[in-house]
């Protein structure tokens, strides 16, 4: 459970520095993880982004102060990171469905979010099916887009990219280069790391290839890794989302493995059929 304890250490760090302008890279460091992998894991375990958790917790504590102290509303707004009373009031109403003034007068029920403690329930009734494989470095060819992790932009925009490439013929072009070991279309997520743009990822739609060039497409080298390949079966995107959650909430905490921090992949069959028995895979590099 060491992996889970690292996540909790990062959460405790956020709580201890809740009134500060937190650097997500520093938070992730508490979990021994990159910014991307920490934020991804946090969202899968809690169904809430890191920024949303911080916002909820700060507004919860602000509501408590409004109810229990005589501090001025403007001072409380500044204390919890809002530059103007108007911005504070707007955010406060969105969460608590009342204004700060109404909260001070005890009107209505506030939406209070408690400090988070990660607990994992090991269900096991429907275990994830997986296989461990060793694979040397290989090349993929495809197109990439850059996405921010802030406010879940990547979660909203990546499905739009898939719709785009499925409708404009890009997938058909890519499949002509698919002559490597992995048969199918890949969704490859590359953490840019702290030395590049903080809070950004490169997302590739690609195929494995042995060819050096691909015309309009770019190439990316995937490092040699030990991979855990998880089976995903069922209609998209529900089956994929459910499996990701199971991996991080049930499999990783007891597996003895850690994420290697290199690119991870989803593998989809070329025909793209959307049926109840649709088969796809999740490839995660581990150490």
Give the predicted meaning of each segment:
Residues 1-3, 128:
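Absolute protein N-terminus
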Residues 4-8, 56-60:
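Short alpha-helical elements of helix-turn-helix
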Residues 5-49, 68-83:
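DNA-binding recognition helix and immediately preceding turn/loop
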Residues 40-44, 48, 60, 64-67, ...:
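A solvent-exposed interaction/effector surface
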């Amino acid at each position: 459970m060491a992996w889970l304890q690292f996540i909790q250490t990062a959460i405790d760090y956020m709580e201890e520095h809740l009134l500060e302008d937190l650097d997500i890279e520093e938070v992730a460091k508490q979990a021994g993880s990159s910014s991307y992998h920490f934020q991804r894991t946090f969202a899968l375990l809690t169904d809430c982004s890191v920024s949303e958790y911080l916002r909820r917790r700060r507004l919860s504590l602000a509501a408590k102060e409004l109810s229990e102290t005589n501090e001025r509303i403007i001072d409380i707004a500044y204390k919890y990171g809002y530059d103007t009373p108007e911005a504070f009031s707007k955010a406060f109403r969105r969460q608590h469905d009342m204004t700060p003034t109404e909260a001070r007068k005890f009107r209505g029920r506030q939406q209070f979010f408690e400090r988070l403690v990660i607990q994992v329930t090991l269900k096991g009734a429907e275990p994830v099916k997986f296989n461990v494989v060793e694979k040397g470095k290989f090349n993929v060819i495809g197109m990439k887009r850059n996405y921010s992790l802030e406010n879940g932009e990547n979660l909203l925009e990546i499905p739009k990219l898939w719709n785009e490439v499925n409708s404009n013929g890009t997938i058909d072009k890519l499949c002509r280069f698919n002559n490597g070991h992995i048969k199918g279309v890949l969704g490859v997520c590359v953490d840019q790391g702290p030395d590049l743009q903080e809070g950004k990822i490169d997302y590739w739609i690609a195929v494995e290839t042995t060819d050096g060039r691909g015309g309009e497409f770019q190439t990316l080298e995937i490092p040699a890794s030990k991979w855990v390949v998880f089976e995903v079966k069922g209609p998209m995107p529900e089956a994929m989302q459910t499996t990701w959650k199971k991996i991080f909430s049930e499999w990783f905490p007891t597996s003895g493995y850690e994420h290697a921090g290199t690119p991870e992949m989803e593998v989809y069959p070329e025909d793209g059929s959307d049926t109840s028995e649709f088969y796809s895979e999740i490839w995660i590099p581990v150490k």
